Amino acid sequence: MQDIVNGRCGWCGTDELYVKYHDQEWGNLVTDDKTLFEFLVLESAQAGLSWITILRKREGYRKAFCDFDAERVAQMTDEDVERLMHFEGIVKNRLTIKSTITNARQFLAIQKEFGSFYDYTLSFFPDRKPIVNTFCSLSEIPASSPESDAMSKDMKKRGFKFFGTTICYAHLQASGFINDHLKDCICRKK
């Protein structure tokens, strides 16, 4: 894989949806808890799959999981799990569907304890500030960091599912707590 393709981080290639996601979302700091929950749901669903697979099903996940309303998702039942096992537009994996409901409940508990999931996330960062890396090559980008290690460990202790350090790191990248746009990427020049 090339490091830079058409001025962008090479991982997004030339797929229109991937390029739009790269340019408009990935690496941009998200302070809104609803959007942070959306990324948490999508990143958890990605376990073992490619990100583009989940990105293409994003609207299906939006419909299936109540427009990413954590309170409504937290109230879902076993009947909802069965319904979602037949829902078009999402990956039909019982464990990840159930984990989304479990994670919604834990997400709400964190909001109650910390005031917001955003503040909870910042608590794992030095000086409570996002990290902007200056990598030149895709091969330099790690799969995890001390921040994702600590956050995923804490989340696991709290009962979150499908959110190990690699998925946590991807979540932190997607939501801009860790900006890994390559040094020569056009998104660095914004």
How should each PLM-predicted stretch be described?
Residues 1-190:
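HhH-family (HhH-GPD) DNA N-glycosylase catalytic core used in base-excision repair
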